[in-house]
Amino acid sequence: VHLSGEEKTALATLWGKNVADEVGGEALGRLLVVYPWTQRFFDSFGDLSSASALMSNAKVKAHGKKVLDSFSEGLKHLDDLKGTFSSLSELHCDKLHVDPENFRLLGNMLVLVMAHHLGKDFTPAAQAAYQKVVAGVANALAHKYH
């Protein structure tokens, strides 16, 4: 992902606000609510019967944090996202059989939830930078698909 110096600064500044704990679970929860067919990958997570159950589900929140921790690692390696996410791409392709379109959908949810949490600090320029990164991460996660 090619980012300008300004974009890299915006990413680092906003990521430094420590919203990852809240944002990951909320983004994953919203994905599961808005795109209910994605729930099939999480049948071991317990009650996914309603929006309320999804948004308060401890396993959804924990997995969302895990996703954001991986995303955070990607922010450290923007020049090698495919290498950074290679093993996760293989896992999601070969073992979990996740439709790679779901990565793009989750990235969009992440941007929306960050905008909600960060308010006016999430400027249009910051949004554009995050859109570039989530698109790059989605592409990297889809890399091992045949």
Curated annotation (Swiss-Prot):
Binding residues annotated for heme b, in chain numbering? H63, H92
- List GO terms (cellular component aspect): blood microparticle; haptoglobin-hemoglobin complex; hemoglobin complex
Please give the Pfam families that the UniProt record associates with this protein: Globin
Task: Please cite one Gene Ontology biological process associated with this protein.
Answer: hydrogen peroxide catabolic process
Question: Where on the tree of life does the source sit, at the highest rank?
Answer: Eukaryota
Q: Which residues carry this modification: Phosphoserine?
A: S44
Q: Which residues carry this modification: N-acetylvaline?
A: V1
User: Which keywords has UniProt assigned to this entry?
Assistant: Acetylation, Heme, Iron, Metal-binding, Oxygen transport, Phosphoprotein, S-nitrosylation, Transport
| All copies of domain Globin, residue ranges | 2-146
Is Membrane there in the keyword field? no
Residues recorded as bearing N6-acetyllysine in the entry: K59, K82, K144
Please give the PROSITE patterns that the UniProt record associates with this protein: GLOBIN
Cystine pairs = none
- S-nitrosocysteine PTM positions read C93
Q: In which tissues is it expressed?
A: Red blood cells.
* InterPro entries per UniProt: Globin, Globin-like_sf, Globin/Proto, Hemoglobin_b, Hemoglobin_oxygen_transport
GO molecular function annotations of the record: haptoglobin binding; heme binding; hemoglobin alpha binding; metal ion binding; organic acid binding; oxygen binding; oxygen carrier activity; peroxidase activity
Q: How does it assemble?
A: Heterotetramer of two alpha chains and two beta chains.
Family that this chain belongs to? Belongs to the globin family.
State its role. Involved in oxygen transport from the lung to the various peripheral tissues.
Q: Kindly provide the name given to this protein in its UniProt entry.
A: Hemoglobin subunit beta
